[in-house]
Amino acid sequence: MTFWNLSDRDSWLGANNYPLPFDREYKPKNVYRVIKNFNPALDNAEIKEDFVPSVMNQPGQQYPMVNSQGYARFRVEAPQARSVIVSLGLGGQGGTVLHKNEEGVWVGTTDGPLDEGFHYYHLTIDGGVVNDPGAKNYYGSVRWESGIEIPAHDQDFYQVKDVPHGQVVQVLFPSPSTNSTKRAFVYLPPQYDGKKKFPVLYLQHGWGEDETAWHRQGHANLIMDNMIAAGECKPFIIVMTYGMTNEVKFGGLASFNFKNFETVLVDELVPYIDANFKTIAKKDSRAMAGLSMGGMETRNITLARPEVFGYYGLLSGGTYSPEDIKDPAQVKGIFISCGSKEGPDRIMQAAEALKAAGFNAKGYVSPGTGHEFLTWRRSLREMAPMLFQK
């Protein structure tokens, strides 16, 4: 295989800003690997023209669209633009180059099918990053991003059904440690009537997201409604708050200080929730879990404050070892998970080591997914039944 003219700038980016095989440091891009592994038989596979609007589109908008194979198709009206690229994923990875038609409208389809579930994306138009006006916005990558949903074969568990529904309520709570007022969202199960007391799961978002992530991108409330209606888990309250107490820009996770959030969560939010909602204010009736960075927060806080939470959950957020906790009686249950594309062996090995040491532990691997919300939706479904069991 030979590539010509790779020593000049246009060969890195292309004359029209189209991405070519190598970056400015001569490192191969994903497109190089695609070309290297090109299979003519696969290339002849037809894309089914059964595209329908994404369920996350703005009302009345036809694009973006998705088909039954998992391809996404985009349409952007920008007649004066010179280039339009769609970047998918947290932080905007890669790019689907759109092409302008005779009407001055930019259209294009992803090179291959996307993983099932939710994906962030944005547009880069002539070098400027903007959202797609056809799609609803979701907070991720430390900014509002567009969202698209690829229908999953097992999506029934997070669909709206004709079952009793709980409420997601917004609360504002004082935070003396940050000299501010913080926001949290609280899921109250259908059985919550202000009389009976319920256990509580404190559920954290990932890096670059906020307290809206779990009930908007993650559909945590719908998952719980459906599981409670089916008798698959006990009813419990879920509290979701903003975990990025340090105002750190995208890419600054290494400098993030977890101690500040520990104070906000344990010393300020937990007492507020216990004082204002009907909760069972005991360690064994509290759980903490989180995805990605939220899992890292969970691990740090549960180890630092073992007297507060009885159940721990790390969703694509690392592992525990028996040496971390030492006494199996200290914790009622541990759940760890990741997607099958995230190096799942370490998750299952860690779960087995915990079980061998006498811990009530469960490991779960989401099939066919990576560091993305379908992994975490499934993880919540798998974790919920083990919480708050006598």
Predicted regions and their residues:
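Aromatic-rich peripheral "rim/lid" segments of glycoside hydrolase catalytic domains that contact
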Residues: 4-42, 387-390
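Non-catalytic cap/lid and distal C-terminal segments of serine-dependent acyl enzymes
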Residues: 60, 67-95, 100-390
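Low-complexity, Pro/Thr/Ser/Gly/Ala-rich linker/spacer regions in secreted
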Residues: 37-49, 326
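N-terminal edge beta-strand
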Residues: 47-70
